[in-house]
């Protein structure tokens, strides 16, 4: 939009505003000059900001660019290792349909770096070796909290186990038996997603 059209539109807007407010517009030249000054001021501000932002970054020599790429790749790999979550399901409840449901859970929250563990020994080994970002436990409350609590009491909140965020949810087999649990499981999965995304 060129300046003259913009000026005319702003001029009419100012007159309409005055009419709505009950003011009588007498000096049209004064309004016209005021609008033109505001437009010039806005232009100068934009030009100044553009000049400030146009400083080009210094180019790195080729050697530094290569090392920068290597550092980025390493940091991505390290991040991938640290963003792993562990899903603990007791081996008595882990079967092929349960694995399929867990895979669907993880896909639904865009988490692909996960490991399903079914024994306490392998869980302890995984925690000590990899230091996962979070643990999603499917109803194995006694081991983690040393108390025989019901799942309704501990699910839906973030707890800690050896300094690692821990979230309890229902067993995948319970979701098969009772599809109404999907909403509650989804709430638990959103907690895990938040832990992965925001820490």
UniProtKB/Swiss-Prot annotation:
InterPro entries per UniProt: Uracil-DNA_glycosylase-like_sf
Stated name of the protein: Uncharacterized protein BB_0013
Annotated organism of origin: Borreliella burgdorferi (strain ATCC 35210 / DSM 4680 / CIP 102532 / B31) (Borrelia burgdorferi)
Higher taxonomy: Bacteria, Pseudomonadati, Spirochaetota, Spirochaetia, Spirochaetales
């Amino acid at each position: 939009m060129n300046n003259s059209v913009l000026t005319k539109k702003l001029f009419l807007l100012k007159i309409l505003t005055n009419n709505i407010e009950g003011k009588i517009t007498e000096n049209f030249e004064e309004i016209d000059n005021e609008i033109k000054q505001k437009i010039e001021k806005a232009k100068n501000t934009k030009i100044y900001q553009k000049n400030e932002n146009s400083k080009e970054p210094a180019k790195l020599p080729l050697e530094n660019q290569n090392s920068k790429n290597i550092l980025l790749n390493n940091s991505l790999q390290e991040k991938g290792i640290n963003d792993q979550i562990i899903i603990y399901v007791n081996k008595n409840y882990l079967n092929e349909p349960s694995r399929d449901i867990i895979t669907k859970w993880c896909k639904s929250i865009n988490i692909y770096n996960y490991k399903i563990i079914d024994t306490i020994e392998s869980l302890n080994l995984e925690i000590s070796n990899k230091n996962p970002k979070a643990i999603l436990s499917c109803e194995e409350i006694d081991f983690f909290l040393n108390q025989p609590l019901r799942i309704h009491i501990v699910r839906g909140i973030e707890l800690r186990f050896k300094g690692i965020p821990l979230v309890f949810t229902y067993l995948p087999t319970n979701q098969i038996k009772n599809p109404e649990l999907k909403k509650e499981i989804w709430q638990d999965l959103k907690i895990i997603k938040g832990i992965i995304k925001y820490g």
